[in-house]
Amino acid sequence: EILEKLGSTFVSQRHMTLFILTLPVIGMCERFGLKERAITLIKNMKNMSTGKLLSCYLFIREVGAAVSLRLSGQAQFIRPLINPMAQGAAVSKYGELDDKNEDLIKGTAAAMDNYGNFFGQNVFLASSGVLLIAGTLEELGYGVNALDIAKASVPIAIIALILGVLQNRLLDKRLSRNLSKNKEDIK
């Protein structure tokens, strides 16, 4: 009876097991230099700024969420790949980063992931958020369906993309201001 219960619980909760399996894969990628290769790739792209890279990622994340393509998230994608690439872009342009600017880039990279996922996922007709909103509104007597919610989410997703790109442009300006001062102080 106990083994049967454990087996059925394991099968019903296998998504948790899949999540746990991604952690060693991420560790192996980090151990064998994925982070360094990502930084080298970005350093070789001369015109790629931190803000441009994060804007591209925001666009990809939002489009991916709109078609229900999951790119994992903070621990599986931002920390091992996007954040090092964004920092590599700043290092190639300005030299070494101090802790304050490193944290600024980390936070912005995480924010772009959140914006893209949060505002992009409701564009997908069958996403859980759209179905929850449609079901709740129907129960309250409003005549809406999932398609109406998804259509109403498109302008919001576009606005979120525009605001994210503006935030990234301001990030580039802030990094330029902060790190150009640091470069001059070193000279």
Residue ranges, per PLM feature:
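Short helix-coil transition sites and intra-membrane helix breaks within transmembrane domains
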Residues: 14-15, 27-36, 66-80, 118-127
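Intrinsically disordered, low-complexity non-transmembrane regions of multi-pass membrane transporters
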Residues: 87-108, 169-187
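Hydrophobic transmembrane alpha-helices of multi-pass solute/ion transporters
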Residues: 1-29, 37-41, 179, 183-187
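Hydrophobic alpha-helical transmembrane segments of multi-pass integral membrane proteins
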Residues: 45-90
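Membrane-interfacial helix-loop connectors
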Residues: 75-100, 127-148
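Juxtamembrane and boundary regions of transmembrane helices in multi-pass small-molecule transporters
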Residues: 70, 74, 137-187
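Hydrophobic core segments of alpha-helical transmembrane domains in multi-pass membrane transport
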Residues: 22-26, 57-65, 130-136, 152-169
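Alpha-helical transmembrane segments of multi-pass membrane proteins
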Residues: 51-65, 94-119, 144-158
